[in-house]
Design a protein with these regions (language model features):
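Structural preference for solvent-exposed beta-strand-turn elements
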Residues: 1-213
């Protein structure tokens, strides 16, 4: 596995997805970020088994496809040391050793097999896609997330309900003491009426990474 990628682009994407990783992962390998290089693109995935985030990074070049997992903290600490420049990643798939080659030298990082990384089950055919302006989703989260609860016994109260129809989007949150409903009439669903429940953790992550426009 061998590819070349922009150091700043990779760092920015990995900083975003790494926010998913919890302090005490249920499996040690979930401290790692899964990297999959294929067809000129690098996919970076982080998960805590409940929430999974994937970033897509265009590669400057891809010599050999493959996949590997690398400890998130080690990788991020290394990337923070580089000014913007192309970095070459060379991975020995037999030993899982990762070499990161820069303009001034190289680092060697121990990786782990991607085969051991738990992959989230694919969505079934009855699932709906939601495509919307980032600013709209961000505004809906900002206007309602403060009303969500922190209740382990009633986890649904820790979420935001998003309802979509042909007329508007509605965001609803409640902790059983207060109820907040926020409607946007400048958005609509083109797939009929449906709804989704967005847990607080991914909602907070989206709040922190989505651009306002």
């Amino acid at each position: 596995m061998k590819f070349v990628v922009s150091s700043n682009t990779l760092l920015t994407r990995l900083q975003a997805v790494s926010k998913v990783i919890g302090g005490k992962p249920v499996q040690p390998i979930l401290d790692n970020i899964l990297l999959v290089a294929t067809e000129g693109v690098l996919y970076a995935t982080a998960s805590d088994k409940e929430t999974t985030m994937e970033a897509r990074i265009e590669l400057e070049s891809l010599e050999e496809e493959g996949k590997i997992t690398i400890p998130a903290k080690i990788l991020l600490d290394i990337l923070k040391e580089f000014p913007e420049q192309p970095l070459t990643f060379e991975i020995n798939t037999e030993t899982n050793e990762v070499k990161i080659i820069s303009e001034k030298g190289e680092f060697s990082v121990p990786g782990e097999s991607a085969e051991d990384y738990p992959i989230q089950a694919a969505l079934n055919d009855s699932s709906n896609d939601l495509t919307s302006k980032c600013g709209l989703i961000l505004e809906g989260i900002v206007k309602t997330i403060f009303a969500t609860a922190n209740d382990d016994l009633r986890p649904v109260m820790n979420c935001i309900l998003i309802e979509m129809n042909e007329d508007n989007f509605t965001f609803v949150a409640s902790d059983a003491h207060k109820l907040v409903r926020y409607k946007r009439f400048d958005a609509k669903s083109e797939n009929g009426q449906f709804s989704l429940i967005l847990p607080k953790k991914p909602a907070l992550m989206l709040k922190n990474i989505l651009p306002k426009e």
